[in-house]
């Protein structure tokens, strides 16, 4: 492992009980709070998938593929990092087990291990630790989110890697935040901590005691629940914070800041903290809760409608744009495969947005919707395939009735969009 910068501090965010409890939002929020106190923060997401990148993952199952400024196809959590921290993340901010394993095998085939028996421990874990050390050099604090839940078979090597890394760089330079889910049973009208207890025990079995436990719940769980988590988690009560569901993810930094988590981390990591400047988050909160006099209705013509996370960054960008224009926003989803049968339904929208996609399914519907926007002088934003749809629609309206693109039909005569030589 390359020797990490000794002055840099590391915060590892793990989760227990189940996935999807908000590790990414929590990591981004903690980073935002520390940045508001004057620190230079970087973030990294580690996923235990054997995929090389997120570009081929099913968006209906996994959510959107977030593309970084240097072209890396990554997890949607990196979008949270960019929006919350106001930074540009790069391919160094995304680590998938498949890519690390591919590179490890390539090095073994090239003889770089000099005949050693290459194993998950120490070789794979060493490679993971190198990813931690090399990602975003120069930051004061590097936050690493470990995907999945502690105890998952596929994620064992990542948890072992953060344990080893903590010992190597010094425990005074590492902090651990563990998210647990606390379910509410309506029958008995109480929150149950047993799943959280088991999740904390799983983490301790790896030799890791969390510095902060974040208890996710539907509503405020109450001090008695926090005391129970504190006792079974082996951490002081002030190190247990309750994170109930929020109306908007942009409220989370303010919620976490009230828990003084930044002061807890500063004490553990010996961090210099300036006075927090949370004005931007308070301003966002005011925009979220404001009653707007005017509401803009936007129709999104898309085909991956099984999972709203498929177009997460598109939706968030629309919301942020609406706040800046001081208007409310109503988004309606329109099935690209059905819209062509009833274009009249589009009359009620103030504008259309057609995002990217792959394959020919639903393309004709997108082209029809784009053509309707052109002919009715409606504001239109086409992203990726959505822009192709607009160009094709314009060509067809202009008389090229069979207009298409090389991506959709590489043998067509009337291609109005071509592929670049390196595509």
Annotated model-derived regions:
Residues 274-277, 381, 400-407:
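Acidic/polar loop patches that form or flank catalytic/metal-binding clefts of enzymes
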Residues 374-390:
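Repeat-solenoid scaffold signature
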Residues 1-351, 358-359, 365-372, 379:
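Flexible phosphate-sensing "switch/lid" loops adjacent to ATP/NTP-binding sites
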Residues 50-52, 388-391:
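Short gly/pro/ser/thr-enriched loop/turn and capping motifs at secondary-structure boundaries
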Residues 77-86, 338, 389-423:
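Pocket-forming structural segment of enzyme catalytic cores
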């Amino acid at each position: 492992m390359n020797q990490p910068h000794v002055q840099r501090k590391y915060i590892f965010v793990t989760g227990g009980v189940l996935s999807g409890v908000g590790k990414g939002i929590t990591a981004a929020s903690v980073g935002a709070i520390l940045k508001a106190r004057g620190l230079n923060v970087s973030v990294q997401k580690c996923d235990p998938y054997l995929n090389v990148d997120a570009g081929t993952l099913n968006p209906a199952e996994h959510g959107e593929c977030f593309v970084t400024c240097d072209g890396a196809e990554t997890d949607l959590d990196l979008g949270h990092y960019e929006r919350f921290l106001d930074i540009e993340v790069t391919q160094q901010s995304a680590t998938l087990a498949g890519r690390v394993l591919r590179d490890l095998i390539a090095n073994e085939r090239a003889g770089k291990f000099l005949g050693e028996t290459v194993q998950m421990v120490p070789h794979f874990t060493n490679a993971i630790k190198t990813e931690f050390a090399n990602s975003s050099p120069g930051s004061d604090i590097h936050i690493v989110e470990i995907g999945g839940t502690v105890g998952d078979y596929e994620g064992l090597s990542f948890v072992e890697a953060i344990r080893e890394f903590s010992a190597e760089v010094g425990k005074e330079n590492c902090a651990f935040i563990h998210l647990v889910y606390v379910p509410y049973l309506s029958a008995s009208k109480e929150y149950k901590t047993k799943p959280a207890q088991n999740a904390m025990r799983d983490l301790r079995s790896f030799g890791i005691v969390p510095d902060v436990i974040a208890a996710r719940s539907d509503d405020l769980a109450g001090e008695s629940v926090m005391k129970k988590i504190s006792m079974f988690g082996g951490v002081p009560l002030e190190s247990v914070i309750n994170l109930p569901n929020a109306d908007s993810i942009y409220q989370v930094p303010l919620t976490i800041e009230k828990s003084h988590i930044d002061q807890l981390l500063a004490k553990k990591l010996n961090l210099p903290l300036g006075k927090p400047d949370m004005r931007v988050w308070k301003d966002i909160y005011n925009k979220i809760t404001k009653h707007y006099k005017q509401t803009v209705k936007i129709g999104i013509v898309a085909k991956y409608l099984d999972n709203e996370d498929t177009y997460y960054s598109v939706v968030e960008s629309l919301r942020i744009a609406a706040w800046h224009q001081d208007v409310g926003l109503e988004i309606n989803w329109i099935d690209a495969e059905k819209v062509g049968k009833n274009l009249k339904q589009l009359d009620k929208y103030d504008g259309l947005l057609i995002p990217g996609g792959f394959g020919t399914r639903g393309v004709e519907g997108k082209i029809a919707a784009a053509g309707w926007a052109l002919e009715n002088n409606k504001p239109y934003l086409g992203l990726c395939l959505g822009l192709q749809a607009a160009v094709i629609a314009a060509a067809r309206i202009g008389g090229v009735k069979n207009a298409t693109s090389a991506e959709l039909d590489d043998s067509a005569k009337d291609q109005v969009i071509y592929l670049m030589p390196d595509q």
